[in-house]
Regions:
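N-terminal secretory signal peptides
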Residues: 1-14
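N-terminal export signals
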Residues: 2-3, 18-41
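Short sequence/structural segments immediately N-terminal
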Residues: 16, 22, 49-52
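Aromatic-capped interface at the extracytoplasmic side
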Residues: 35-55
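Membrane-cytosol interface motif
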Residues: 52-65
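Residue-level detector of beta-strand structural context in well-folded domains
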Residues: 56, 67-69, 186
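Extracytoplasmic/periplasmic/luminal assembly and interaction segments
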Residues: 66-114
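Rieske [2Fe-2S] iron-sulfur-binding domain
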Residues: 96-207, 211-215
Length: 215
C-alpha cells in the first residue's frame, strides 16, 4: 500500500522529535524485530524521499464519516479527518465560536485556500499538522460526545494531555489554554475526489509550512 497510514482514532502522546523513534522502540520492546522494517517502510516513504520533502499521496476512499487517519509527511504527523454534517454544523455554531481564541484564522497558520470557517479545501475533509502549538506534543483526537476525560457536552476536537490545550475539529485553539495558535494546515491538494497529495499546493497557489507562526 503506497499510502502512509499510521493510525485511526486516538493518537498517542509523543513529542514531535520522537514520533518515529518511539514507534520503532515500541516494536522492538515486544520482540517483533523481524516486523520492524516492513512496518517502518509502510509508515513513511524512503529516507531520500523524506529528506527531499517529497509529497505524500493519501487514498481517502477507506475513511468513513467521523473517522480520522494519520499519515507522516516530513516527519510530522498529519491528521486527515472526514467530518460529518453534524460536526460541520458545530464548527459554525456560535457556541463553538465563542470558545475559540482565533475563530477566523487571522493568524498565519494555514494557506489562503484554507483560511475559511472549516480551514480546508473541502468542508468534509480536514487536513492538519497534529502537533500542539504550545510545546510540540501530539494531542489526542476526541470525537464529539461525552467522555470521562472531556466530560459531557464536548463538541469534538483535540485535547493535549501535556498541559491541557484544546482545539476544535477545524484545529482552532480554545481560549484560556497554553497553546497560542491554531493547529497548522499543511500544503495539500486534491488529485481526485478520493485522493489528496500532502506537500503540494493547488495550481496557482503558493504556501510553505515553514512560513507559519508556529508548528
Amino acid at each position: 500500500m503506497s499510502d502512509d497510514f499510521v493510525s485511526a482514532g486516538h493518537d498517542p502522546l509523543i513529542p514531535r522529535r520522537d514520533f518515529l523513534t518511539l514507534v520503532a522502540g515500541a516494536l522492538g520492546a515486544v520482540g517483533v524485530a523481524s516486523a520492524l522494517w516492513p512496518f517502518i517502510d509502510s509508515l513513511e516513504p524512503a529516507a531520500d524521499t523524506l529528506a527531499a520533502g517529497a509529497p505524500v499521496d493519501v487514498d481517502l476512499s477507506p475513511v468513513k464519516p467521523g473517522q480520522q487517519i494519520t499519515v507522516v509527511w516530513r516527519g510530522h504527523p498529519i491528521w486527515v479527518l472526514r467530518r460529518t454534517d453534524d460536526e460541520l454544523k458545530t464548527l459554525q455554531s456560535q457556541a463553538d465560536l465563542s470558545l475559540l481564541r482565533d475563530p477566523g484564522s487571522a493568524n498565519f497558520q494555514q494557506p489562503k485556500y484554507a483560511q475559511n470557517w472549516h480551514r480546508s479545501i473541502k468542508p468534509e475533509w480536514s487536513v492538519l499538522v497534529g502537533i500542539c502549538t504550545h510545546l510540540g506534543c501530539v494531542p489526542n483526537f476526541e470525537p464529539p460526545g461525552g467522555s470521562q476525560q472531556m466530560g459531557p457536552g464536548w463538541p469534538g476536537g483535540y485535547f493535549c494531555p501535556c498541559h491541557g490545550s484544546k482545539y476544535d475539529l477545524a484545529g482552532r485553539v480554545f481560549s484560556g489554554v497554553p497553546a497560542p495558535y491554531n493547529l497548522p494546515v499543511p500544503p495539500y491538494t486534491f488529485l481526485s475526489d478520493s485522493k489528496i497529495r500532502i506537500g503540494e499546493n493547488p495550481k496557482g497557489e503558493t504556501f510553505e509550512l515553514a512560513d507559519v507562526e508556529q508548528i
